[in-house]
Amino acid sequence: MKERELEMISLICVSNDHDKLNTILKASLSRQKNVEYELIIVDSNKYGFNSAAEALNFGGKQAKGDYLFFIHHDISFQDDFELAELESYCKKFSFGVAGVAGVKNIEGKVATFSNIFHGEQKTKAANKSISTPVEVDVIDECLIIVPNKVFSKNQFSVIGPTWHLYGTDFALQMKLLDLPVLVFPSELWHVSDGKSLNLNYFDAIQWLVQRYSKNYSVIYTFFGVWPSNPILLKMKCFYRKLRFYIKGV
């Protein structure tokens, strides 16, 4: 009988910035030890995708690894064994999707869980640190981990022309399948400041909520709590667009 090939991670990165890709992500990957991986680069300029979901699904379908790591080009692994440690969590825990930062509803309040750092000053990205994987409601998109056996049956939903909320979408899919949504302890560095909010986000949240309105009364994200009631949602998005236009937040 043919011996099974070694387990492997597939890293999928959608990038339009070769400098950041080479100096941040690839540079830190070159130092990783005790782990087998392939790196799949999807050039968003070359293919002209209209959404993150399309680009990530395109890359994910090329993956041969047991676990798919959808990763931003400005992620830097700070420890030489960090990728191997994340792989060990994948093997020890059963999950539908995992990340390194997430949001959870605790008694009506949004709490963020993560050990990662972000921004040039390397500030903590969340208000709660963890020492073991924790279950959350949704995850941040800087790193999304999906078992290949899950991705073969479930891809990112194309909710509209947007590069937002694909991690939230996948987490909501997994919860409907009763598959855990986890955050793994990791002290990696997301070199950008994580401030990806723009006006398109508020269109995307309306598309996303419309898709899941029969399943969830509210949806939790890093930028707020969003009601499934269409009137309340439109009012909130109008207010948030106005606030963003005036204050940038």
Name each model-derived stretch.
Residues 3-6, 24-37, 41:
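Short, acidic, metal-binding catalytic loop of nucleotide-sugar glycosyltransferases
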Residues 46-63:
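Glycine-rich, basic loop-to-helix element that forms the pyrophosphate-binding segment
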Residues 68:
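Short aromatic/hydrophobic "clamp" motif used to bind/position activated sugar donors
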Residues 72-76:
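The conserved acidic donor/metal-binding loop of glycosyltransferases
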Residues 80-113:
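Conserved donor NDP-sugar-binding/catalytic core segment of glycosyltransferases
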Residues 125-146:
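A recurrent flexible, glycine/aromatic-enriched loop bordering the glycosyltransferase active site
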Residues 152-173, 180-190, 196:
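Donor nucleotide-sugar recognition loop
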Residues 177-249:
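Active-site-adjacent helix/loop segment of glycosyltransferases
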